[in-house]
């Protein structure tokens, strides 16, 4: 019985080690939101994802992307997954290629609960854009005549 278990362990161990090497690498991004005396509904927090890519002068963005809310023992976090499919304009460029940020088309508004934890694939960055409500614009009410 012991020999059978050792044989099974010897057969399974290389596959377990091989699977660990091919697991996708991720980065954890933790954002501490600024403290304010204003109520939380005065702010919107938008998350945007990007990659640093060698690209010419054309406008470009990455297609797709998916943001999932998950929960573990440490609390709520978000997990982003996105592809490498690039969309861009097709104009002629004089300059060569330069390394610059290319954003995914996906952006999403998140609740203002600090800290915000986002897991991204290796090489994908995340940033939080903070929007503040400056004033509320009321609509003009026009009286219409019924015909």
Q: What role is predicted for each listed range?
A:
Residues 4-13:
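Sec-dependent N-terminal signal peptides
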Residues 18-60:
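N-terminal export/targeting and maturation segments
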Residues 20, 109-110:
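Aromatic- and glycine-enriched beta-alpha-beta binding-site module
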Residues 28-30, 75, 113-115:
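Intrinsic-disorder/low-complexity, polar/charged segments enriched in Ser/Thr/Lys/Arg/Asp/Glu/Gln
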Residues 44-108:
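Mature extracytoplasmic domains of secretory-pathway proteins
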Residues 110-147:
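C-terminal partner/receptor-binding element of secreted or periplasmic proteins
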């Amino acid at each position: 019985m012991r020999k059978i278990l050792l044989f099974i362990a010897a057969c399974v161990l290389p596959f377990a080690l091989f699977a660990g090497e091919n697991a996708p690498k991720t980065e954890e991004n933790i954002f501490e939101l600024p403290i304010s005396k204003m109520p939380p509904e005065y702010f919107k927090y938008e998350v945007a994802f990007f990659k640093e890519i060698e690209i010419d002068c054309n406008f470009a963005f990455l297609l797709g992307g998916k943001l999932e809310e998950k929960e573990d023992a440490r609390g709520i976090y978000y997990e982003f997954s996105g592809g490498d499919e690039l969309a861009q304009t097709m104009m002629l460029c004089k300059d060569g290629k330069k390394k610059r940020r290319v954003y995914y088309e996906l952006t999403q508004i998140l609740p203002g609960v600090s800290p915000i934890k986002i897991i991204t694939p290796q090489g994908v960055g995340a940033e939080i854009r903070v929007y503040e409500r400056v004033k509320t614009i009321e609509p003009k009410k026009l009286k219409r005549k019924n015909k």
